[in-house]
Amino acid sequence: SELKVATQTGFVRGLSLPVLAGHVSAHLGVPFAEPFLRPEPVKPGAEMWNPNLNIWVPSGRVGAFXFLTVTLFGESAGAASVGMXLLSTQRAILQSGAPNAPWAQVQPAESRFPFVPVIDGEFFPLGVNKDEGSFGVPGFSKXXESLINQAVPHANDIYTDWQDQDNGGLPLTGNPTXPHN
């Protein structure tokens, strides 16, 4: 059914959609709106601080699902979080990250640099992971081929062993003891 919510700047249209646990309010053009309240955006990435908030199982209705399967997908640090969730589940898909990676277990006090992008001190999630480790670093570009990528075309093919960061990097192809061609 159609919903109308009054705001300071007028009405916002929305829909009440049926789901297994009841109804969900969806307001058009208002991301992260609170249902039945004046639509206001929540803090960006609020659930990113506790990834378990993104996992929802309808308590009391599990029997309706017969064989309940939950797929958790995460890349990079998200994959490390998915791996941590494996401690209480059976299977998961990890992409470029693992819970036993040294960086996945670093305490905030030990962290040498903040994650980017950060707006007003809060993590701001983006929807891409190409060159994610160099985002915000001078000389690198997310939108086009950067000068550094043009000058060193094989830069992305060099693997750094994070257990031994001073080893100079190992090429991913060819003879690992010879310089990369």
UniProtKB/Swiss-Prot annotation:
GO terms for cellular component: extracellular space; plasma membrane; synapse. Residues 162-181 are annotated as: Disordered. PANTHER family: ACETYLCHOLINESTERASE (PTHR43918:SF11). InterPro entries: AB_hydrolase_fold (IPR029058), AChE-related_enzymes (IPR050654), CarbesteraseB (IPR002018). It catalyses: acetylcholine + H2O = choline + acetate + H(+). Keywords: Cell membrane, Hydrolase, Membrane, Neurotransmitter degradation, Secreted, Serine esterase, Synapse, Toxin. GO terms for biological process: acetylcholine catabolic process; choline metabolic process. Gene3D superfamilies: alpha/beta hydrolase. Its EC number is 3.1.1.7. It is found in: Synapse; Secreted; Cell membrane. Its main location: other. It holds the Pfam family COesterase. It is an enzyme of class 3 (hydrolase). This is Acetylcholinesterase. In venom, its toxic role is unclear: it could result in less musculatory control by rapidly hydrolyzing acetylcholine, or that it works synergistically with alkaline phosphatase (ALP) in paralyzing prey through hypotension. In muscle, it terminates signal transduction at the neuromuscular junction by rapid hydrolysis of the acetylcholine released into the synaptic cleft. In liver, its function is unclear: it could serve as a safeguard against any diffusion of acetylcholine from synapses into the circulation. The active site is at S76, E132. It is a peripheral membrane protein.
